[in-house]
Amino acid sequence: MSSGGAGIADMQVRFDGCPALSGLLRGAGCKKGNRMESRDDPVVIRHRELERYANAALKAGRIMMESGASVSVVHRGITMIARGFGVETIGMRSGYTSIAMTVHVADQTITRMLQVGRLGVNHRLDLAVRQLCARAEKGGMSVEEVEAELARLVRETPRHPAWFTAVAVGLACASFGRLLGVDWLAFGPVWLAGAIGQYLRHHLLHRGVNIFIVAGAIAFLSATLGGLGAIALQSATVQLAMMASILLLVPGVPSTNAQTDIMDGYPTIGSARAVWVLMIMLFAATGVWFAEELLGTRG
């Protein structure tokens, strides 16, 4: 059997006595012919080009959303890339876990959707992708170039080491604690408790542990460590020290984005972000409650 077409023809002759099978084989030959014709169909070719444009723009939007950008910023970046490819964006929809867009050129229209991963905060990567969107909007960049640049940015954008971030976060917790009224005796314990909590949170999240469980566990651990340190040093602000030790869990960027999205006319994802913030605070409060019960510091 030298080829698919020849093989079908041979089988049609061989099973001439079976009309049903002969019809089935003729149908298979027609389907193969249709597939070959579709490869050269200009409509199909243009459809695939639109699909590539949409996917490249959506990838940029997904990275921005996962890096902490608001919906309006994400939509603007996606539109800029699509415009650079010479297509018109006629519709976009963002959910908490997905983004979709519809692009149009001439008489061709296509809709595509990408799933969005865990939403975090990475302002360096967010800014780098925004700058790429601005370059792509000017034209002259192919789909391959845009996708390659996105991959490079994800791979090479500098990130602070986990230990450095932990030390900085711990210092921030202690500094905010001072503003809240924590005395100097509790400053060191709060710094240490916040740093340990941030370091463990970083590794737990990268291992895929549920973010709400992490919030509750880290709140309990950091509050307990901060409280024990304050008690050991005979601080007069033990409860404040325990509260300051968990300030690392306050979801500042998601809270701001929730308000921004609702005010910008995206109430669905804004409400989803707000519920997420409330859940984080609920689990954090539960962790602190258990820590206070353990140390006997509840009034």
Where are these regions (language model features)?
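Soluble N-terminal domains of membrane-associated systems
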Residues: M11-M141
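Alpha-helical transmembrane segments and their membrane-interface boundaries
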Residues: D107, G117-G299
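Short hydrophobic transmembrane-like helices used for membrane targeting/insertion
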Residues: M1, I8-V13
